[in-house]
A protein has these predicted regions:
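C-terminal nucleotide
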Residues: 1-23, 27, 48, 52-83, ...
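ATP-binding N-lobe of GHMP and related small-molecule kinases
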Residues: 1-125, 129-145, 150-159, 164, ...
Length: 293
């Protein structure tokens, strides 16, 4: 995204540019909101933000793919539900930063990117993290990467209203070229795992199935709610804490809840097994585990 587009939109040069990548998850599906383990990697598709500070308390948000202002919001009036559409992810990030004590300045923001929307590649998390980086720079504030990821998640959870886990934002802030990110979503401890497929003559292929993926459509929230319900019935803080799968199955009489518990418990172990194989140099040995995921 060139600065010419910013000048065309706002009549002046930007002060800063920021970008954050999307992600794919190698293994560890539906485990992040169960305090489990995930193994994503950043991809060479990203959200990009150009920003310039304003002298007032207004955020003007424009998409590089449109000519009109998507949203113009008063920073002192931000509240969940006050901004619609994709601009809510931008405004929500400013709102979350303010709640953390950051004096977010007014700003003109031009947003672009090449992370496909609705394809399960975390375009929203990439946008939130890029906006957070740009606004923090304008505010003259530095925060740890983990704090940025958590604030981006808060924006999506509490402002936009999507009950996502924290994997996507951590992958966007902590992604490293040539590595997977092993994240314990309970301790929030990240560990980079070398991932050199080319050395094995392999390629990771990401395929767009054309099946729409929307976290806001209710299905994701329902799945998360069923996992939380199962944890309550089993008397554990989260499904991460289930240690005896057979016993857990016998305590549940609902097929859906049994399926949720079985997946989370076995998926957490598969993540750890994949990491062990990769660290032992056995990339090809991960295949059966990925198939079982």
């Amino acid at each position: 995204m060139s600065t010419d587009a910013f000048v065309a939109a706002f009549g002046r040069e930007p002060d800063i540019g920021w970008r954050s990548p999307g992600r794919v998850n190698l293994i560890g599906e539906h485990t992040d909101y169960n305090d489990g383990f995930v193994l994503p990697l950043a991809i060479p598709r990203e959200a990009r933000v150009l920003a310039a500070r304003r002298d007032d308390r207004v955020l003007r948000i424009v998409s590089a793919r449109a000519t009109d202002v998507a949203a113009e919001v008063d920073l002192d009036s931000l509240a969940p539900g006050s901004v619609d559409g994709w601009a809510a992810y931008v405004a929500g990030t400013a709102w979350a930063l303010q709640g953390h004590g950051v004096d977010v300045p007014g700003a003109d923001l031009l947003v672009d990117g090449d992370v496909p929307r609705g394809a399960g590649l975390s375009s929203s998390a990439a946008l939130e993290c890029a906006v957070a980086g740009a606004l923090l720079h304008l505010a003259g504030v530095e925060l740890p990467l983990a704090a940025i990821a958590l604030l981006a998640q808060k924006a999506e959870n509490d402002f936009v209203g999507v009950p996502c886990g924290v994997m996507d934002q951590f992958a966007s802030t902590h992604g490293r070229a040539g590595h997977l990110l092993l994240l314990d979503t309970r301790s929030l401890e990240p560990r980079h795992i070398p991932f050199d497929l080319a050395a094995e003559g392999l390629t990771l292929v990401v395929i767009d199935t054309r099946a729409p993926h929307r976290l806001v459509d209710g299905e994701y929230a329902a799945r998360r709610a069923s996992c939380e319900q199962a944890a309550v019935l089993l008397g554990v803080p989260s499904l991460r804490d289930v240690t005896d799968l057979g016993s857990a199955m016998s305590m549940l009489d609902d097929d859906v809840l049994q399926s949720r518990v079985r997946h989370v418990v076995t998926e957490n172990q598969r993540v750890l097994d994949v990491v062990a194989l990769l660290e032992a140099g056995d990339v090809r040995g991960t295949g059966p585990l990925l198939t079982a995921s």
